[in-house]
């Protein structure tokens, strides 16, 4: 599909947190689908600034900026939009808890892949192929 046939580009950043072969996912209030935690950047924000802000808003933890490392950039068509997700790993401080905008947190293995959007599935595939996601 060419860019002319796809609507807007949704440019996001996401935090990849894997423990025991599972990746942390969040389901926002009012949504049925789980996402890798993160979100859209505000004007003038870097990926790192967006990541730190979004994770603090969604999960009430503080990412350690000096530990932010790129994982990869993934792109997929989702409905009428093209979604680009820049993924990063980072250490954090605090206790993982869902904020008021998040209905549920879950640790997903590869078998839960159908419960996430197309762009997240690309990351799931790569992590599974590398043996990081069970």
Predicted segment positions?
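Nudix hydrolase/Nudix homology domain
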Residues: 29-34, 98-134
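A short coil-to-beta-strand element that immediately follows conserved catalytic motifs
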Residues: 62-72
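Active-site-adjacent beta-strand/loop module that shapes the phosphate/pyrophosphate-binding cleft
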Residues: 11, 73-98, 103-107, 123, ...
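Conserved Nudix-box catalytic region and its N-terminal flanking loop in Nudix hydrolases
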Residues: 18-58
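Short loop segments at secondary-structure junctions
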Residues: 20-22, 91-95, 110-112
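Intrinsically disordered, low-complexity, charged terminal extensions of DNA damage-control enzymes
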Residues: 61-62, 94
């Amino acid at each position: 599909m060419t860019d002319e046939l796809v609507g807007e580009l949704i440019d996001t950043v996401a935090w990849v947190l894997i423990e025991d072969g599972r990746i942390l996912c969040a389901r926002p209030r009012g949504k049925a689908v789980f996402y890798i935690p993160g979100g859209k950047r505000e004007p003038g924000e870097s990926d790192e600034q967006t990541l730190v802000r979004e994770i603090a808003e969604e999960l009430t933890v503080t990412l350690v900026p000096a530990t932010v490392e790129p994982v990869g950039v993934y792109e997929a068509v989702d409905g009428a939009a093209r979604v680009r997700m820049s993924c990063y790993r980072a250490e954090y401080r605090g206790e993982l808890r869902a904020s008021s905008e998040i209905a549920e947190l879950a640790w997903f293995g590869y078998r839960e892949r159908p419960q996430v959007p197309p762009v997240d599935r690309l990351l799931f595939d790569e992590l599974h192929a590398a043996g990081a996601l069970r």
